[in-house]
């Protein structure tokens, strides 16, 4: 069986020219050949910003680029038919499709309602700082451009827990809506800001049974319409775990698919929170390993001062590898984004080796690391910046190595602050498999490592071409392997036939 590898096929600043669905359709065969087994596509539903929407400012779940709404028929990425054609092409190439689902909030309501709210302290949302009073909020959604096709469900204030704008006074604040489903916010895992149920826009009220049923009905429709194989669930930190337990169980039952699910619970450096969420969802979904990403970023910033023996300390992949999706970057951590924490370019080849060539975790590569990216935006300081993200050196070879070479027993040599390595013995199923990986964040390094007696007498070379040596494996399956300074080498049999 081939090792699984995900590609996130978008980034926040992908051009809004409607080309993405067409591009993945063209690229699918090449990506499958390279070694990718699943493609994570961006949110396909119409956002309130129309063609300018990256998909997370969700307006209409049933509009996949089909209806003239928010000043456009297509989304940023293309039309509904182009989306379905792209999914067909990905499937034809032998890969799976993971769709990005935003069920935390809705944006761009069609009509304002007069609703009763209490204002809360933004830093402690459990503290009410006003008596109940009326505001005007855009909480009515009836999707006039769709005219009831696929669903005639009308969303109103009873479908939401909170909003952040009073259209009457034009005041921006966080308002808890008084409805029939409790005195305040929904119960979520994180007590950051007192209660972090509210994130943005109109926050969906999953305590309302009509809302839960509509979201299940939509999930069925979406799966039947597109045939996706898995889901990436946005902002699960802000949604009660009980909702996704119910939703995922329902979806798997009615679709007869054990489809893959990964949640975005971004809590860098806070492994206990990730584990708490995994306990609450009882293993129904994987999570992105925000803790490992935190370590990779720190390693890239600290250079030789970072102790590489600690790279997997307090990470999800170390304690729950079967539910860990490992990443080097994503659309939230890229430069100028809300959770900006990019891994510096010099360290990225090492970071990708750490997620792609080891036995644990389900790695996910990021679009700009394969294709590069260039864009402009304002930073947190209000100034405009031009960003260039170069493609990562040797990333295609590293993905290919995961596909062809990184199999069999793993032996770790995480024993030096500036130079660590591991070996994979290889197996009979994958011809020519087996490797020795060595990386250094300081000077040139070397390490004696065992690749297994099955390789005795073979000559190993650096698959990445970063080190010129040729290494002979001794009768015990061992050899001394080398790596250049601030670099990674992947040693493989010269003759892998």
Region locations from a protein language model:
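Active-site-proximal helices and loops of the catalytic beta/alpha 8
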Residues: 2-4, 26-32, 36, 45, ...
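Residues at alpha-helix caps and immediate loop-helix transition turns in enzyme cores, especially N-
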Residues: 20, 82, 243-244
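Core domains of carbohydrate- and sulfate-ester-processing enzymes
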Residues: 119-195
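Active-site-adjacent "subsite" loops/lids of carbohydrate-active enzymes
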Residues: 182-225, 236
């Amino acid at each position: 069986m081939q090792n699984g590898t995900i590609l996130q096929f978008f980034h926040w600043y992908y051009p809004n020219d409607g080309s993405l669905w067409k591009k993945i359709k063209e690229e699918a065969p090449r990506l499958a050949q390279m070694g990718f087994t699943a493609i994570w596509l961006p949110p396909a539903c119409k956002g309130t910003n129309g063609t300018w929407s990256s998909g997370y400012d969700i307006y209409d779940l049933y509009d996949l680029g089909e209806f003239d709404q928010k000043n456009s028929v297509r989304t940023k990425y293309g039309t509904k038919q182009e989306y379905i054609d792209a999914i067909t092409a990905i499937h034809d190439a032998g890969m799976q499709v993971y769709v990005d689902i935003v069920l935390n909030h809705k944006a761009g309501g069609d009509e304002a309602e007069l609703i009763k709210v209490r204002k809360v302290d933004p830093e402690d949302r459990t503290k009410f700082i006003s008596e109940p009073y009326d505001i005007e909020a855009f909480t009515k959604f009836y999707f006039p451009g769709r005219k009831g096709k696929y669903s005639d469900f009308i969303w109103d204030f009873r479908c939401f827990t909170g909003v952040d704008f009073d259209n009457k006074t034009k005041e921006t604040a966080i308002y808890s809506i008084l409805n029939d489903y409790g005195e305040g916010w929904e119960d979520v895992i994180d007590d950051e800001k007192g209660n972090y149920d509210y994130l943005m826009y109109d926050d969906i009220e999953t305590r309302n049974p009509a809302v839960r049923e509509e979201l299940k009905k939509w999930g069925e429709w979406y799966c039947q319409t597109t045939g996706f194989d898995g889901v990436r669930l946005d902002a699960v930190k802000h949604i009660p775990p009980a909702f996704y337990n119910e939703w995922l169980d329902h979806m798997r039952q009615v679709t007869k698919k054990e489809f893959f699910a990964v949640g975005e619970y971004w809590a860098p450096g806070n492994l206990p929170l990730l584990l708490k969420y995994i306990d609450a969802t009882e293993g129904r979904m994987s999570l992105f390993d925000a803790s490992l990403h935190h370590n990779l970023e720190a390693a890239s910033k600290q250079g030789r001062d970072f102790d590489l023996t600690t790279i997997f300390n307090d990470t999800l992949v170390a304690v729950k590898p079967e539910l860990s999706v490992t990443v080097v970057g994503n659309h939230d951590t890229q430069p100028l984004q809300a959770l900006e924490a990019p891994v510096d370019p010099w360290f990225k080849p090492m970071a990708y080796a750490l997620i792609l060539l080891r036995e644990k975790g389900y790695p996910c590569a990021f679009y700009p690391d394969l294709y590069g990216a260039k864009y402009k935006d304002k930073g947190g300081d209000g100034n405009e910046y031009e960003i260039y993200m170069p493609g990562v050196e040797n990333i295609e070879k590293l993905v290919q190595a995961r596909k062809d070479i990184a199999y069999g027993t793993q032996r770790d040599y995480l024993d030096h602050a500036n130079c660590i390595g591991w070996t994979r013995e290889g197996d009979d199923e994958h011809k020519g498999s087996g490797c020795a990986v060595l990386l250094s964040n300081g000077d040139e390094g070397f390490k004696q490592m065992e690749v297994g007696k099955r390789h005795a007498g073979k000559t190993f070379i650096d698959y990445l071409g970063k080190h010129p040596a040729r290494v002979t494996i001794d009768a015990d399956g061992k050899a001394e392997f080398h790596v250049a300074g601030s670099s990674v080498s992947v040693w493989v049999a010269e003759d892998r036939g």
